[in-house]
Amino acid sequence: MRESSQIRETTETKIKLSLQLDEGKNVSVQTGVGFFDHMLTLFARHGRFGLQVEAEGDVFVDAHHTVEDVGIVLGNCLKEALQNKEGINRYGSAYVPMDESLGFVAIDISGRSYIVFQGELTNPKLGDFDTELTEEFFRAVAHAANITLHARILYGSNTHHKIEALFKAFGRALREAVERNAHITGVNSTKGML
């Protein structure tokens, strides 16, 4: 089974995270940031991943360190769980509508970290979650996992719906990218490595 568990402790946060790429039944998320918990749960459910997150952070300051560090640990776990990346599709993409909003995510498990994030989040805060942290989370995941990630909000008016569409699209795109493919021998690259 492709899985990874890691702990990251700093003076700002303590993150314990486990990710199972091939088993999506066990999802439990507690970060102390309610909206972020909701988004991570949606990501796991729509990607059919197992995900357990326990996070403690300096949320009395704001949620920035917690959200970013969870992204770092998730990216690290993804990188470790994929091992040598043999036999996977490598690429994945998904459009996801959420009522009036439409989100799109494309992923390349390339071994090169890069992110493009496009979208207007008009409401600056949802509960304890600063909406600008959406981009910070995706950036942290992409850099830690060494993947290329494009996330785009095509349109919408409700900020909650826009972010929800992105997290669901992220789960679905990542599921496609990590899926094993019987037609792929070795790694899906002419270089012979990713």
Swiss-Prot record:
Signal sequence span per UniProt? Answer: none
Q: What class of enzyme is it?
A: lyase
InterPro entries according to UniProt: IGPD_sf, ImidazoleglycerolP_deHydtase, ImidazoleglycerP_deHydtase_CS, Ribosomal_Su5_D2-typ_SF
What subcellular locations does the record give? Cytoplasm
Q: Annotated pathway, please?
A: Amino-acid biosynthesis; L-histidine biosynthesis; L-histidine from 5-phospho-alpha-D-ribose 1-diphosphate: step 6/9
GO terms (molecular function) for this protein are: imidazoleglycerol-phosphate dehydratase activity
Q: Which UniProt keywords apply?
A: Amino-acid biosynthesis, Cytoplasm, Histidine biosynthesis, Lyase
Q: What is its EC number?
A: 4.2.1.19
GO BP annotations of the record are: L-histidine biosynthetic process
> By its UniProt entry, which HAMAP family does this protein fall under?
HisB
The record's section on NCBIfam families has:
PRK00951.1-2, PRK00951.2-1, PRK00951.2-4
Give the family, as the similarity comment puts it. Answer: Belongs to the imidazoleglycerol-phosphate dehydratase family.
Task: Tell me what this protein is called.
Answer: Imidazoleglycerol-phosphate dehydratase
**Native organism:** Bacillus anthracis
